[in-house]
Regions:
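Beta-strand repeat architectures
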Residues: 242-247, 265-271
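Beta-strand/loop motifs with alternating small/hydrophobic and polar/acidic residues, enriched
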Residues: 2-145, 149, 161, 358-363, ...
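Exposed boundary/loop context
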Residues: 3, 17, 104, 171, ...
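Short, ordered "entry" segments at domain starts
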Residues: 99-234, 238, 257-263, 281-294, ...
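Short, exposed beta-strand/loop patches in secreted or surface proteins that constitute
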Residues: 79-82, 243, 289
Length: 388
């Protein structure tokens, strides 16, 4: 074993003492900094939880604006939401309903998340919301999101719209007394089946389901609506000629067919300003069935429309296929608007007259208007988002 060299006996002790002194001087501040870091991390985590909770409140308010709009404003949630153990209070305000606003409204959402220690974070968000508006669509006699075919000696007294004018196919004897417009002239936002379904479901929720078949002969009084048919529906008349009057919305989830009754059992449908909404196909292919009165016939699928048109030309009827073809060949002059998503085909001898739908009492989404009932939301944009 090596012997200890002269003058080295006290060096180790001195070094140990120096380390202990320096460590004592630096350890306390270092531990203090570590404690401060832990505390700061806890504060940061709490503020982050508050921010997430306040953000969740804004998202919940947006859902309410889109799906369960309040009746009056400003609207304050009756009970705070509990998110991340924070109480979240939410207030929704809206600009006054003004017919000049078009299809948009502005909303303010104030969402405040408060912790147990009284600390809070607030998000102040301003939104612009667009609502379903068929006004531009109803300004035309014929509308298609794809192609239009006009045959024979068809006469159209009104404007025609489709995305590309080159997709308008007409025979040489067709007369169009109006303007042919496409996407370059006017932009039309095509509505979806879901938007229509949401809008008309409000009219019929919890109402009568007539079953898969009705005979007008057995109805007393001869009125229908509001009806909600969970499936398909066939309508016939085996009795004497009669008139069927719509009193409210008819909503059919499946297909709806007005069965050809024969001349001795003919009947008339008075639309009476109401709407027939069909989730599948719609068929009314018999001139033994007459139609009069303003109203709407809207089907998600195909439409076969060949009734006898009666009236004085002052009624406005919307016949619309949302995703399918519209085959149109009625007897008599038609007044209103014909719409098809993939194809609109008018047969020879049809005369279509467009008049203004204003004042006809149509139950269709027309933007915010001056009605308390708002149509489905079609767009939502965040104008500002402030955190405090």
């Amino acid at each position: 074993m090596k012997a200890v060299a002269r003058n080295q006996q006290g060096n180790v002790l001195v070094m140990v003492l120096i380390v202990l002194v320096v460590g004592g001087l630096t350890l306390a501040p270092l531990l203090g900094l570590m404690g401060t870091g832990v505390l700061a991390g806890q504060v940061y985590e709490n503020k982050t939880d508050e921010l997430y909770a306040a953000d969740a409140g804004v998202e919940d308010a947006i859902w309410k604006i889109e799906n369960n709009v309040p009746d009056s404003y400003p609207y304050q949630y009756p009970e705070p939401l509990i998110v991340n153990d924070k109480n979240v209070s939410i207030t929704i305000s809206r600009e006054d309903l003004d017919p000049t606003c078009g299809d948009q409204l502005r909303y303010q959402i104030i969402s405040t998340a408060t912790g147990e220690d009284g600390s809070n974070t607030t998000i102040d968000a301003h939104l612009s919301v667009s609502y379903m508006d068929l006004s531009a669509l109803l300004d035309n006699a014929i509308v298609s999101d794809n192609t239009i075919t006009l045959k024979g000696d068809t006469v159209v007294n009104g404007d025609v719209w489709l995305p590309d004018e080159e997709d308008l196919l007409v025979d040489s004897h067709v007369t169009i007394n109006g303007t042919i417009k496409d996407e370059d002239d006017v932009s039309i936002v095509w509505p979806t089946a879901e938007q229509f379904s949401t809008y008309y479901m409000e009219d019929v929720e919890g109402t009568y389901d007539p079953g898969s078949f009705i005979d007008i002969k057995d109805l007393y009084p001869k009125t229908i609506g509001p009806w909600y048919r969970e499936g398909s529906l066939g309508v016939d008349n085996t009795g004497d000629p009669d008139t069927l009057v719509l009193e409210d919305t008819i909503y059919v989830v499946g297909n709806l067919e007005f069965i050809q009754p024969g001349a001795s059992h003919n009947y008339t449908i008075n639309l009476n300003g109401q709407t027939i909404f069909v989730g599948g196909d719609f068929a009314l292919a018999s001139t033994s069935i007459s139609i009069f009165g303003s109203g709407c016939i809207i089907a998600v699928g195909d439409i076969n429309f060949q009734p006898n048109i009666v009236g004085d030309g002052d009624d406005f009827v919307l016949v619309m296929s949302v995703t399918g073809e519209t085959f149109f060949h009625p007897s008599g002059d038609f007044t209103g608007c014909i719409v098809g998503d993939t194809h609109v085909q008018l047969q020879p001898g049809c005369t279509i007259d467009w008049i203004s739908p204003e004042g006809k009492g149509l139950d269709v989404p027309l933007g915010i208007g001056d009605d308390d009932r708002l149509p489905p939301v079609t767009g939502l944009g965040i104008e500002s988002w402030e955190i405090s």
